[in-house]
Amino acid sequence: MVLALVLVVGLPVTGLTAARAVLFPQVDSPERVDAIVVVAGSNDDRYVYARSLAEEGVADHILVSQPPSGTGRYAAAIDSYCTSTPVTARDGRRIDIECFAPDVDTTEGETTAATRIAHERGYRSLLVVTYWGHVSRVRMYFEQCFDGPVYVTDTPRPTSISRRYALLHETGGYLKAFIRPAC
């Protein structure tokens, strides 16, 4: 009886909370961080946006997930982005772009690799760039694995992923992140 009550009340509440986190995420705009992290994705402008943020002075370092599963135009674009380092900002600052292979080709693997590199480099604060539906799950993973302040933002030009697809995919991932922490 108690289990049935927990399921009847708990599942819808959990589902609504996860749906809210996916569809209406908290997006951050910090003035300055030690590094910007770009988690993988091919259908939006997250790489261009991360570089733009760095050029505006938000950070001097960009860490970019370069999954081994990338193919075709996506892989070529990431390769080109990764070889463009260092970049000189308009104000003369040097911006370093460091690409890394995720520990596992998942958001969890990107998180563990990026936070390990951040610790090794002495970064104390991070801004993670992803797409709108991924913001809350990325925040959860990075907050599980990184000791310092973590900010997460989406791109100004959103991906064409449908809200329905994002809700289904990211809600499942969000629940997985809640049940099985990355770190």
Located regions from the model:
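A transmembrane-helix-recognition feature enriched in membrane-embedded lipid enzymes
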Residues: 163-183
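A structural signal for short, hydrophobic/glycine-enriched beta-strand patches
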Residues: 18-167
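N-terminal type II signal-anchor transmembrane helix
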Residues: 1-27
